[in-house]
Amino acid sequence: MIVVPVKEGENIERALKRFKRKFEKTGAVRELRARQAFEKPSVAKRKKMQKAIYVKQLQVAEE
């Protein structure tokens, strides 16, 4: 469970923004979407490799 204490005099919008950031970092939404349908381990591995190659190409192009 995510707990975001609201500080004295803190704007509720700012506290909500901190909550959203913490929630996003936990990866709960990503995990729920991934678990909606079964994915074979070989397919998951292939996707992971393709993503790694893509990120590597972006890094090389950036330099």
Curated annotation (Swiss-Prot):
Single GO biological process annotation from the record: translation
Gene3D superfamilies: Ribosomal protein S8 (1.20.5.1150)
GO MF annotation list: structural constituent of ribosome
GO cellular component: ribonucleoprotein complex; ribosome
Keyword Plastid in record: no
Annotated keywords: Ribonucleoprotein, Ribosomal protein
Annotated Pfam families: Ribosomal_S21
Family: Belongs to the bacterial ribosomal protein bS21 family.
Protein name: Small ribosomal subunit protein bS21
Organism, as annotated: Porphyromonas gingivalis (strain ATCC BAA-308 / W83)
Higher taxonomy: Bacteria, Pseudomonadati, Bacteroidota, Bacteroidia, Bacteroidales
